[in-house]
Amino acid sequence: MKFTVLSLFPAIIKPFFENSIMKKAINKGIVSFELVDVRDFSKDKHKRCDDLPYGGGAGMVLKAEPISFALEHVESAKKTTIFLSPSGIKYSQELAYSLSKREEIVIICGRYEGIDQRIIDLYVDFEISIGDYVLSSGEIAALVLIDSVYRLLDGVINPNSLLEESFGVKNGLLEYPHYTRPYDFKGIKVPEVLLSGHHANIKNWRLVKAREKTKKNRYDLYLKYLEIIGEDNGFDKKN
């Protein structure tokens, strides 16, 4: 998969591709990337890419021309173009799985008040929000999306990890608690079942704890889980 990022500040993005698991994925040929500096496509002598909004209001808006030139520079018939914005559809693990099946993802990083709507109308396949909050940097949102997608690609991480983690394809629950050495930390001991070696009991304990955590922290996901399994198995639907 190729990630292409259009940004006014590509230096924010670059280190992510040069470290840790992402670097290994690139070395294996699983992932490639291109960083496009939108300023390089500005016709303004000062390389400005923003202007005042029509209709008035606070802040500046990214101009259509440099972004359109940058997008046309990215030659690929198989690209999926994404603009990250608080006004977009809410991002989810399900959408991350869907995007992981694409061949190339092009991400437009927003700044200031946003971008000219005509870019969204003409070029964007998905306008996505990573949550109900506002960031000053679209680059941070881009890193969230990239990280959530590339880790789902074959050969990046252990596929069994994807089954058990939060929002996993197995059941959609939040992940169960984890413990490691020491056995006793400040008077809190590791649950005995995890030391028993009894795999069926451990599996059942983890499911129970995952359900409890999901019910407590994300009741919406818990109700969705109950709909999927078609029963509550003793877990009532009341708060």
UniProtKB/Swiss-Prot annotation:
Question: Got a GO cellular component term for this one?
Answer: cytosol
InterPro entries noted in UniProt: Alpha/beta_knot_MTases, tRNA_m1G_MeTrfase_C_sf, tRNA_m1G_MeTrfase_TrmD, tRNA_m1G_MTases_N, tRNA_MeTrfase_TRMD/TRM10
Q: Which reaction does it catalyse?
A: guanosine(37) in tRNA + S-adenosyl-L-methionine = N(1)-methylguanosine(37) in tRNA + S-adenosyl-L-homocysteine + H(+)
List where in the cell it is found: Cytoplasm
Please name the SUPFAM superfamilies in this protein's record: alpha/beta knot
Extract the coiled-coil ranges from the record.
Answer: none
Q: Tell me the keywords, alphabetical order.
A: Cytoplasm, Methyltransferase, S-adenosyl-L-methionine, Transferase, tRNA processing
Protein family (similarity comment): Belongs to the RNA methyltransferase TrmD family.
Quaternary context:
Homodimer.
Mind telling me what this protein is named? tRNA (guanine-N(1)-)-methyltransferase
Encoding gene per record: trmD
